[in-house]
């Protein structure tokens, strides 16, 4: 079995592992008492690893990767950039856009959230999904639904924990909701044009590390999500996460260097001719023909099922999951998902289009998947409007 990525506490030792095939050197950066301690990591194939002889639970950390600076070749190596662990599950703050995040040689330790070594959390007991196809799925934005709710305690408004409150559950049950579909709750960064306009991204479709919950939406981290899922399950309501695995918030060539881009962009993003492919409309596209990208995606899904008991996932821009040059209905990711003991029975919902060539793939996902159907949506809208 391959070694686990991220931070792993084993008794009195904490092991760190990150993938960066083309880096010349990688440092583990530990933050405590207002100081940064840098520890050289050792190469292990395409990975870099380090061990710290203590239980680092609660400690903040990040990485720095050194090597060639050649963005035209997918090499954004800059040791001045603090990088978030792609396998981080907890962050100490939200992301905030700053142009310094894109500038070579400008240190960003003060700007980038630090990953937090998480406390041990056992797996939930395996259970079949609470939702079966045919029931009502209620798509919701956590903050928008709860931030002004008068019957939710003020401290919980706008958070995942608010969904476990009796008033919210009663509302869902009055509507006969079979499952809630939570719009993205992992940490994201605002697109670079928004701050100057006095705007912010409220939907969350611009993630950086796919397992790291947003500290604003889920201040209690995994324990909060886990408790909320359990509370909804107790009332017969399933939980589906809207998840963005098709791109990162590092955008195009002018985007911020936050995680995968600084670790080795060419090892994660699609760029067959050296140019970033933009099948997502977000500046970059993760390469699901790459086994390492598929592993990160599968580890992410497995993490939320094992640690929190979620019932399934809605996949943003689903065709990206099956792209080589075009869409492949027999793509490896689909087969690996179907063979995974934690994931095979989950509810899987595709948004069956992206911005790439042949991007409209309604009806071509595996038979055990559900699909968003824009034709039904448009027909339904016309019917109710009387068009």
What are the residue ranges of the model-derived segments?
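Conserved alpha/beta catalytic core and glycan-binding cleft of carbohydrate-active enzymes
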Residues: 88-91, 309, 324, 328-387
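The feature marks proteins involved in alpha-glucan
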Residues: 1-13, 36, 42-139, 146-155
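Short proline/glycine-enriched turn/loop motifs at strand-loop junctions of beta-rich domains
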Residues: 19-25, 56
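Beta-strand signatures of extracellular beta-sandwich domains
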Residues: 27-29
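Substrate-binding/active-site clefts of carbohydrate-active enzymes
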Residues: 141-310, 314-339, 358-359
């Amino acid at each position: 079995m391959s070694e686990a990525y991220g931070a792993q506490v084993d008794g009195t030792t904490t092991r760190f592992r990150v993938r960066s095939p083309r880096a010349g050197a990688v440092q583990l950066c530990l933050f405590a008492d207002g100081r940064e301690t840098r520890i050289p990591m050792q190469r292990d194939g395409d990975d870099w690893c380090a061990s710290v002889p203590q239980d680092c639970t609660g400690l903040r950390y990040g990485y720095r990767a050194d090597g060639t600076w050649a963005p035209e070749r997918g090499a954004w190596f800059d040791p001045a950039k603090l990088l978030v662990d792609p396998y981080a599950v907890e962050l100490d703050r939200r992301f905030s856009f700053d142009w310094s995040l894109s500038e070579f040689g400008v240190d960003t330790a003060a700007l980038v959230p630090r990953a937090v070594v998480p406390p041990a959390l056992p797996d939930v007991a395996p259970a079949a999904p609470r939702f079966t196809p045919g029931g009502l799925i209620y798509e919701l934005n956590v903050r928008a639904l709860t931030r002004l709710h008068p019957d939710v305690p003020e401290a919980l408004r706008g958070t995942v924990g608010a969904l476990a409150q009796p008033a919210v559950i009663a509302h869902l049950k009055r509507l006969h909701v079979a499952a809630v579909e939570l719009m993205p709750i992992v940490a994201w960064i605002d697109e670079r044009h928004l701050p100057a306009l006095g705007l912010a991204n409220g939907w969350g479709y611009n993630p950086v590390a796919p397992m790291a919950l947003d500290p604003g939406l889920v201040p209690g981290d995994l324990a909060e999500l886990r408790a909320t899922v359990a509370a909804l399950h107790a009332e017969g309501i399933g939980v589906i996460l809207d998840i963005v695995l098709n791109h990162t918030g590092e955008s195009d060539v002018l985007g911020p260097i936050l995680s995968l881009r600084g670790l080795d962009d060419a090892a994660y993003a699609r760029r067959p001719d050296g140019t970033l492919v933009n099948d997502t409309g977000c500046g970059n596209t993760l390469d699901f023909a790459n086994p390492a990208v598929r592993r990160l995606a599968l580890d992410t899904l497995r993490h939320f099922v094992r640690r929190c008991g979620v019932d399934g996932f809605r996949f943003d821009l689903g065709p990206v999951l099956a792209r080589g040059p075009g869409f492949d209905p027999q793509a490896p990711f689909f087969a690996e998902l179907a063979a995974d003991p934690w994931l095979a029975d989950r509810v899987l919902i595709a948004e069956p289009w992206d911005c790439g060539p042949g991007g409209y793939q309604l009806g071509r996902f595996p038979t055990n998947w559900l699909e968003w159907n824009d034709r039904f949506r448009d027909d339904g809208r016309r019917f109710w409007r009387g068009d």
